[in-house]
Amino acid sequence: MEAIIVYTTFPDWESARKVTRELLERKLIVCANLREHEAMYWWEGKIEEGKEVGAIYKTEVSKWKELRETIKELHPYDVPMIARIDLDKLNREYSEWMARVLFG
């Protein structure tokens, strides 16, 4: 099993929970960590500030393409950042649990 973490942000708790629940129901992820934080970014020529909800999704590399496309489809942002982080080390027990959840 090749575990990955996928990171994205949402404008609010409602959209973060809605998308995350859908990803869980489709078994594209095994777990999510959601956390509110302050964001600063360039948008349409000026610096913006505000609150966002960051989402860390735990999954397996074979789910990456479908997960990315599903996030794009459901995400409220015009240009969501969807980053994949490959994990070269993961404890065996967690890896085995992920496999059971994702693949039965």
UniProtKB/Swiss-Prot annotation:
GO terms for molecular function: copper ion binding. Binds 1 copper ion in the interface between two trimers. SUPFAM superfamilies: GlnB-like. The keyword Cytoplasm applies. Keywords: Copper, Cytoplasm, Metal-binding. One of its GO terms (biological process) is response to metal ion. Pfam families: CutA1. One of its GO terms (cellular component) is cytoplasm. It comes from the Archaea. Its cofactor is Cu cation. InterPro entries: CutA_tolerance (IPR053426), Ion_tolerance_CutA (IPR004323), N-reg_PII-like_a/b (IPR011322), N-reg_PII/ATP_PRibTrfase_C (IPR015867). Homotrimer. The binding of the copper ion probably leads to oligomerization. Belongs to the CutA family. Involved in resistance toward heavy metals. This is Divalent-cation tolerance protein CutA. It comes from Thermococcus kodakarensis (strain ATCC BAA-918 / JCM 12380 / KOD1). The lineage of its organism: Archaea, Methanobacteriati, Methanobacteriota, Thermococci, Thermococcales.
